[in-house]
Every structure is written in C-alpha cells, then in structure tokens.
Regions:
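Extracytoplasmic
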Residues: 6-8, 36-41, 51, 55, ...
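Solvent-exposed, polar/charged alpha-helical surfaces in well-ordered, non-transmembrane soluble domains
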Residues: 3, 39, 54-58, 62, ...
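Flexible glycine-/small-residue-rich
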Residues: 45, 95-97, 119
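C-terminal recognition in membrane/secretory proteostasis and scaffolding
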Residues: 117-138
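Gly/Pro- and small hydrophobic-enriched strand-loop and loop-to-helix capping segments
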Residues: 66-76
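Gly/Ser/Thr-rich loop/hinge elements
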Residues: 1-51, 78-83, 99
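Generic structural signal for well-ordered beta-strand positions
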Residues: 106-107
Length: 138
C-alpha cells in the first residue's frame, strides 16, 4: 500500500529480527500513483489502529505526505510466529520488532498523531472528521 503513495525505494519500515537483531529494511516498490503530486492528506488513527496501519501511517507521516490526526495508536510493532507443539497446543513467539524509517519504535506507546483529538471533550464522532477537515482547509 505504501508504494501507492511514496517514491520508489523509500524506507517504509525497519524490522529487527532474531537473536542478533538483524536489520531488514522494507522499501517501496515504485508504483507511486501520484508521482509527487499528492494532494493534502489526513490519516485518522486511534487506539484500534495497529500493526500494518501503524506502519503505513508512520511512513506517510515521516515523509511529510500526510498529517496524522486522532489519538495514539495501539503499538503493535512486533512480528509473531506460531509454533505448533501438538495438534491442540501452540506457542506464539515474538521474532521481530518494527520501527519507522526514522527509528521510532511502534511498540513503545504506538504512533503519536500530529493533531490530537481530545476524546473526552469530543461532542460526537464528528469531532474526528471536524479535526481532519480543519487540517485540510488550513
């Protein structure tokens, strides 16, 4: 998905895997639909935004292509593998951690939006949309 918005070769996420923390860098593949002519964009996030959605939001945020609006994300920056022990017993093991291109750990509290929506003060679910529209019309 990130390849649709980011130039070819842009670092989307850094993965550190294994006991030696081998770094695997994941980059875009160059299908950039907008070819640098991306209109203003807002990405809405909340505590339910996890894993791949955090990776995409973080990549767009760090590249300056989107303003992230909402509340801090879940913080699911880990990769698990399922090891079958028996037919009825499995063990889920964390085998890697994800970091944004700039080295921000997705697991450490999730992503912080550029514009925070105060959920306590929100009068309706439209508060999220109102915040996004305000960013887009400034």
């Amino acid at each position: 998905m990130a390849s649709r918005f980011l130039p070819e070769g842009t670092v989307v996420v850094r993965e550190f895997r294994g006991p030696d923390l081998e770094e695997v860098v994941h980059t875009t593949q160059g299908t950039n639909w907008f070819n640098g002519n991306l209109p203003s964009m807002v990405v809405l996030v909340d505590q339910g935004s996890a894993s791949a959605s955090e990776i995409l939001a973080g990549a767009l945020q760090e590249q300056g292509l989107a303003t992230v609006v909402g509340t801090p994300t879940f913080g699911k920056g880990s990769v698990q593998e399922l090891i079958n022990i028996t037919d009825t017993l499995s063990l889920k093991v964390t085998v890697a951690r994800w970091y944004t291109a700039n080295g921000v750990s997705i697991s450490d509290g999730g992503l912080t939006p550029d514009v925070l929506v105060d959920v306590e003060a929100a009068t309706s679910s439209d508060s999220w949309i109102d915040a996004a529209v305000k960013v887009l019309t400034q």
